[in-house]
Amino acid sequence: MKRQISSYKGRKLCLWQKLLLSAVLAGAVTFAGLFGAVLYGSYDHIQGDPRAMVVLGCQVMPDGEPSILLRDRLDRALDYLEDHPDLTVVVSGGQGPDEPTTEAQAMHDYLVAHGVNSGQILLEDQSHNTDQNLRYTIELLAEEGYDTTEDILVVSNGFHLTRVRMLWSRAARARVSATVMVLAGSKVVSV
């Protein structure tokens, strides 16, 4: 056994081994870069003085209640609204095939039940994916007189925000200058 190890250490790598090693290293560097971008995008970056808040939709349960992820987004929005009670809120999300109501309506009902004035909530209820959420929300905000190149607060889950920034920049031709992270289940679990 000792002899094989010493002969292996002295052996040179052939071309296919070098290529395989290079591919593995390139993959690891790429993964680390993407992971870093997602991690960076998942932190709170509230900048400026947002003129409106957008809460992106997520699954609605068969009983019409928001899913855990959606409830976390809504609770984080409610936390922010405590200090900014006059902020316009856009709830964005259509109705999936297994949902009894639109995500926007479920979010509206949840926010109103928790004390938000119905008049300050705008519903975007036609979208079925993140790209549509953002495009339709930008159109709705523009119709209501908001400049979507200014600070807009977007509420979603941390894993989602890097993609949201990219899609918002493309749709609004401006960067998302304020975002909020929400942790799934509002709990940090150690394994």
Features from the language model and the residues they span:
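N-terminal type II signal-anchor transmembrane helix
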Residues: 4-45
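A structural signal for short, hydrophobic/glycine-enriched beta-strand patches
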Residues: 35-190
